[in-house]
Regions:
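Active-site region of glycoside hydrolase catalytic domains
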Residues: 29-162, 174-194, 217-220
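Short beta-strand segments at enzyme active-site cores
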Residues: 5-16, 48-54, 188-191, 224-225
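Cellulosome-associated attachment modules in secreted, modular CAZymes
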Residues: 257-319
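Surface-exposed, active-site-proximal loop segments in enzymatic domains
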Residues: 13-30, 60-74, 203, 233-242
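Short, solvent-exposed loop/turn segments at secondary-structure junctions
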Residues: 15-19, 114-115, 195-199
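Extracytoplasmic/secreted proteins, especially bacterial periplasmic and envelope-associated proteins
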Residues: 27, 31-34, 38, 84, ...
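Substrate-binding cleft of secreted/luminal carbohydrate-active enzymes
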Residues: 163-252
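Substrate-binding cleft of extracellular glycoside hydrolase catalytic domains
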Residues: 1-47
Length: 319
């Protein structure tokens, strides 16, 4: 946050206790409630660049409904429990005070699976602030996007990019657009990616870039999962791969017509932009609608001192 980054905080596996929800709901819900009460209290005064997410991939239980079978036994019950937990999450955060009353919240889909989350049984929670987005993950096809070596459930695939692959990607992105984006619900693809071991380099570039563009073109936010540092050097704050970096930059230029912070629209973010924003807040200069959009570093529709601070930090960090 000090570096003007967006941060998503969620519960992520945590030893697997969430798997016990179907058999020990009271204990699990109590633990879930206590965790989010404490997190909400600790971060209640943080700005909107901090997002809370209800869960990672753990909402959905094969012990209630076996998603891999053709049976629907237990399906409604399993979805109802997912919906109940997500509603509990929203209620806890909204009741905690501070900026949590309007904080952007990310609602975990059913197993963060696109097919299952687009099912009518999945329901977005009621939110008085109307600041909820849905979270899904994309690792399809799994033999390319997950496997590095042959496994019991499939053989590793080294290439990606056939017409069928592109059609499959567009099919899933269209599903999300129809189920959520077109209804005013933002979508964050909170994880997508693929390994590089035993993969064709051109296919890796194409897959990562294609998913990114498919999401951006439908006004969804893709987040590349790279905790192992395959593509991004966190110590140097730069991409390892210049080809992938160039691909991403082209996508941003194509689908993002506003460069946040570039208030004077000269193509870069400098101290001149900070001065211009300060002059606007002091009512010495007026901003056009496009300039005001670029100045809204917090993306909250309001220009104030928080935007000046964030913009100044950006200039100091990257110059």
């Amino acid at each position: 946050l000090d570096y003007n980054l967006h941060v998503i905080v969620n519960l992520h596996y945590d030893g697997g206790w969430l798997a016990n929800f179907p058999t020990d709901k009271e204990t699990c819900m109590t633990k879930y409630t206590r965790i989010w009460e404490q997190l909400s209290d600790a971060f209640q005064d943080y700005g909107d660049y901090l997002v809370f997410e209800s869960q990672n991939e753990e909402l959905g239980w094969d012990s209630l409904w076996n998603r891999w079978s053709s049976s629907t036994d237990g399906k409604a019950e399993s979805y109802a429990l997912v919906n109940e937990i997500n509603q509990k999450f929203v209620d806890i955060v909204r009741a905690s005070g501070g900026n949590n009353a309007k904080r952007h919240l990310l609602i975990s889909g059913y197993g963060t699976d696109i097919d299952l989350t687009c099912d009518p049984l999945f329901q977005m929670p009621q939110d008085p602030a109307n600041h909820c987005a849905v979270s899904v993950h994309y690792y399809t096809p799994s033999d390319f996007a997950i496997l590095e070596e042959d496994a019991s459930w499939g053989k590793v695939r080294s290439t990606w990019g056939t017409d069928a692959d592109i059609q499959q990607l567009n099919h899933y992105m269209d599903m999300l657009q129809t189920a959520f984006v077109d209804k005013g619900v933002p979508v964050i693809i909170g994880e997508y990616g693929c390994p590089k071991k035993n993969k064709d380099a051109d296919s890796v570039w194409l897959f990562l870039s294609s998913v990114c563009e498919a999401a951006y073109s439908r006004k969804m936010c893709p987040v590349m999962w790279d905790v192992t540092g395959l593509h991004y050097d966190r110590s140097a704050c730069q991409m390892y791969d210049s080809v992938l970096q160039e691909n991403f930059q082209k996508i941003l230029q194509t689908y993002n017509d506003t460069k946040i912070g570039d208030i004077n629209q000269d193509g870069s973010v400098t101290i001149a932009d900070v001065v211009l924003l300060q002059q606007h807040l002091l009512q010495e200069k007026s901003l056009t609608a496009a300039q005001a959009k670029a100045a809204d570093t917090w993306s909250d529709g309001v220009l104030n001192g928080f935007d000046v601070t964030a913009l100044r930090q950006t200039v100091l960090t990257f110059t």
